[in-house]
Amino acid sequence: MNKIKVVELFAGVGGFRLGLENTKNGIFDITWANQWEPSRKIQHAFDCYSKRFKNGIHSNKDIAQVSDEEMANTEADMIVGGFPCQDYSVARSLNGELGIQGKKGVLFWQIIRYIQNTFPKYLLLENVDRLLKSPSSQRGRDFAVMLSTLNELGYNVEWRVINAADYGNAQRRRRVFIFGYKQDLNYSKAMEESPLDKIIYHNGLFAEAFPIEDYANKNRVNRTHITHDIVDISDNFSFQFYNSGIMKNGEILTIDTIPKYEKSVTLGEIIESNVDDGFSLNQDQIDKFKYLRGPKKIKRTTKDGHEYYFSEGGMSETDSLELPARTMLTSESSINRSTHFLNVDGVYRTLTPIEAERLNGFPDNWTEGMPIKMRYFCMGNALVVPLITRIGNQIEKIDSITNDEFSQLRLF
């Protein structure tokens, strides 16, 4: 099998790369990777990435400062990356000559620039699931801008919101994965002959990698057609995107699908047996955690003197060891309501950095060498590695489709 040359953007500590390098056939070759953390003198994530991976070019600068020429000179059959959910609104330039301008600093437009310079066969992107609903004032606009842009560049797109715990992992981490593929590929031609709902339920990439029930949750199904006028979309588009969907030549079908659940790993199964006393909590810290996790009704006053009550429901006193962990955030190193709070054999403590790595499917001590606070921060930013391996296995199958096989193709 031929190698798939991969460019990894916003690489973090290498979750995409690690997942792709663990695939069945191992045909992914990361040729160029970029990681840059703004306003940080020490680039801990980049240093970790460079320590763990020796092959390929590692770029440690603002992606906006990477020239078109440098992008064009990289080998890219596929672009991957997890990028932040930002404001994707667009406007036409005053003279009209520059076409559509995304808001300055929005990293999605840097992905588009990379695509325009390389036109890879595949795209694999990851984002928080609220991308499908943002902004709250114009639901679905941001994702529609993305889809319209990719459609204009000649890509079809499949997407799925995946909760890692639904497919056998130890963390309830919900993210949207977006798979784009050029419309002239054999896979696209095969999908051209398939009804949109069949792609979502049965023979699309995500249907194969993460099986779902063959009916919609509460009959939630939505269709639309998207245009190339992203200024009009930015100004006027509003639409309900569900957790699964496909865009094929501008036609969109989205369905609220139900996973075929796999037995998840529990928090208790990944915790370390011998933990340093430094992760144990004193009584003041224990009391603070219990207060933060408890129900509240607090009287507050606005700047103009208006009084109101802030209410917050209670959580379980500690995180259950019999369930998958909750979603890790970048603030996992601090005492707050979202941080995991454990009672292990009568000892109250937090997660260790190794446990945080295990929840994302990284090898133990992957982030060793950076400050503990940064180890948690990097894991709060990371994705669940085994999900990428499952997706990568399907991309390997897709890439192996030959012209001779196409006429009689029945996918996988």
Swiss-Prot record:
One GO MF term attached to the UniProt entry: DNA binding
Reactions that this protein is recorded to catalyse: a 2'-deoxycytidine in DNA + S-adenosyl-L-methionine = a 5-methyl-2'-deoxycytidine in DNA + S-adenosyl-L-homocysteine + H(+)
Domain SAM-dependent MTase C5-type: 4-402
Active-site residues (renumbered): C85
Entry's EC annotation: 2.1.1.37
Record bears the keyword Transferase: yes
InterPro entries to which the protein is assigned, alphabetical: C5-MTase, C5_DNA_meth_AS, C5_MeTfrase, C5_meth_CS, SAM-dependent_MTases_sf
UniProt family annotation: Belongs to the class I-like SAM-binding methyltransferase superfamily. C5-methyltransferase family.
Protein name: Type II methyltransferase M.Sau3AI
Species this chain originates from: Staphylococcus aureus
